[in-house]
Amino acid sequence: MAVWLAQWLGPLLLVSLWGLLAPASLLRRLGEHIQQFQESSAQGLGLSLGPGAAALPKVGWLEQLLDPFNVSDRRSFLQRYWVNDQHWVGQDGPIFLHLGGEGSLGPGSVMRGHPAALAPAWGALVISLEHRFYGLSIPAGGLEMAQLRFLSSRLALADVVSARLALSRLFNISSSSPWICFGGSYAGSLAAWARLKFPHLIFASVASSAPVRAVLDFSEYNDVVSRSLMSTAIGGSLECRAAVSVAFAEVERRLRSGGAAQAALRTELSACGPLGRAENQAELLGALQALVGGVVQYDGQTGAPLSVRQLCGLLLGGGGNRSHSTPYCGLRRAVQIVLHSLGQKCLSFSRAETVAQLRSTEPQLSGVGDRQWLYQTCTEFGFYVTCENPRCPFSQLPALPSQLDLCEQVFGLSALSVAQAVAQTNSYYGGQTPGANKVLFVNGDTDPWHVLSVTQALGSSESTLLIRTGSHCLDMAPERPSDSPSLRLGRQNIFQQLQTWLKLAKESQIKGEV
């Protein structure tokens, strides 16, 4: 693989799926920061578009039905897509389709990641499809509640079907060309489900860090965070895990003390909002949990402000006399480092301000759509991270009921309806036993989301790959000399799996079966 291409292999969408409150904002910014850092690093190489260099990808628009399940509703919207045809061998070559998730897609979506990296080997056409209601693919009427009912994973998959048919006509793609879907995080789930629901149209899929099991109370997230903080393989330790608990206990003590202690805490931890009310205290504690969880989720990724090893060093007073530091001081320093890296002044806001922001129907043209993704968590997935398990090192204050209240406050959706929606999602897609073949599920055991994915093969044609010490979508990140042997082997396995699939596709082409 050429050096310049390796530098462009940034994560396709490294945002968190955690769809609530301050945690959502912080993890979203962490993911965007990492992606932007990797893109700017590639640009810093001084790459030009001279002879032999990559051509700029093309952007296009597809007219899609707003409600394809209602034959009497002919309303439509424009869905953005990107195309990289630099390596395409023509009509019979494979199509690598990168599916967008809960954010906007730019030209980098077809210039980096698995599809672009693997395209030269097989002469593939690389296409990315932006998810409805995100980025610039927002229907008329914007983000009003009446419109959001047309936002769902099922409708997104219907868009994939119609896009495949329309793009085949537009680019004169042979009916025998195999279409292979790629995606990371929520988009990884979409990639797996596209193969599950439409095997006659999607030949195979690579699903990276795909949380295919919806869950209301996602306490398992912090179970993985706790284990990772103790993992010596990534710089954790029992001492580090204990220090996190001590630091959070000190934060809660100061919150209970009120007065000067609470005022000092607000300043030291950059809480932009009053801390007198329990709901605002939960916002701060949730943001602190997200900060530590984000360090674990993105551990080892280029551009991440802190690694687990570095965080543990801060909490344990590394680099100096430990008696001159406390876990709370280390946590405060971690907050400063992360906020500085993100160019952000506030770690948390008041609950009232958070609700007001999420009620805004003004579309976000870049990054993650917070209102849209919250709606999808309320109507399909849940994913509400809690700390009710005794093994959790954080605070129990950001409890599930207070999180579910946000669905009611913003969208008027009851806790019961959210629970029912989560159950329906698992019933429709099959949860962690989807039953799809020709799907490769790729996960890292450090990533808190891997517990919602498929990590054990359910059959000979439903493969899994678990990368030791791997974080969220790490297999999609830029190749580096410091990559672990398990990550290098994982990428080789992805290449080999794709090679096997495309050999099968070629044999089917010869037999006229594709």
Curated annotation (Swiss-Prot):
The active site is at 185 (charge relay system), 447 (charge relay system), 472 (charge relay system). Expressed predominantly in cortical thymic epithelial cells. It is an enzyme of class 3 (hydrolase). GO terms for cellular component: endosome; lysosome. Keywords: Cytoplasmic vesicle, Glycoprotein, Hydrolase, Protease, Serine protease, Signal. One of its GO terms (biological process) is protein catabolic process. Belongs to the peptidase S28 family. This is Thymus-specific serine protease. It comes from Homo sapiens.
